[in-house]
Amino acid sequence: MKKKTSLSEEDQALFRQLMVGTRKIKQDTIVHRPLRKKITEVPTRRLIQEQADASHYFSDEFQPLLNTEGPVKYVREDVSHFELKKMRRGDYSPELFLDLHGLTQLQAKQELGALIAACRREHIFCACVMHGHGKHILKQQTPLWLAQHPHVMAFHQAPKEYGGDAALLVLIEVEEWQPPELP
């Protein structure tokens, strides 16, 4: 095995002789503070609050009037119907996907609220919600919930590449991003 030092015996002896009487320096100039847990808890708490706020709009008792013939679709009154046509043609490609398979109605509402909050926070305009076929509970409820939310501009049955009739493409109203003003 090769030794780690490349110094000769003389150099090592000289070094030891010069180091006689020295002691290790105690590091006392920099105080290391422990990491605070509050820093990581605040964003988590804020995210949970955003989800709760966003899912507040979803009611099982209110039934918005949606067209029951043809593919599932909805457009808010102040939004052009041309947006539905663009969604149907596949002009929009979703940046976020939400899979509701296996969730309860309560969990699905919370996840929908979280999706809408995340889209607004990240300035994402189009998302895909996959409700699946299943027992048709989430398939029937998801459009009713989405139509109640004020930040949902429109939704349409997804094109085949995004899930077809087991998914919805959703357009979310996002605030325009403004760069910070310089002083």
UniProtKB/Swiss-Prot annotation:
Record-listed E.C. numbers: 3.1.-.-
PROSITE patterns: SMR
Keyword Hydrolase: yes
Smr domain span: 98-173
GO molecular function: RNA endonuclease activity; rRNA binding
Coiled coil: none
EC class: hydrolase
GO biological process terms held by the UniProt record: rescue of stalled ribosome
Highest taxon in the source lineage: Bacteria
UniProt keywords, alphabetically: Endonuclease, Hydrolase, Nuclease, RNA-binding, rRNA-binding
Entries under HAMAP family matching the protein: SmrB
Function description: Acts as a ribosome collision sensor. Detects stalled/collided disomes (pairs of ribosomes where the leading ribosome is stalled and a second ribosome has collided with it) and endonucleolytically cleaves mRNA at the 5' boundary of the stalled ribosome. Stalled/collided disomes form a new interface (primarily via the 30S subunits) that binds SmrB. Cleaved mRNA becomes available for tmRNA ligation, leading to ribosomal subunit dissociation and rescue of stalled ribosomes.
Homology family: Belongs to the SmrB family.
Subunit structure: Associates with collided ribosomes, but not with correctly translating polysomes.
The protein's name: Ribosome rescue factor SmrB
Species of the source: Salmonella typhimurium (strain LT2 / SGSC1412 / ATCC 700720)
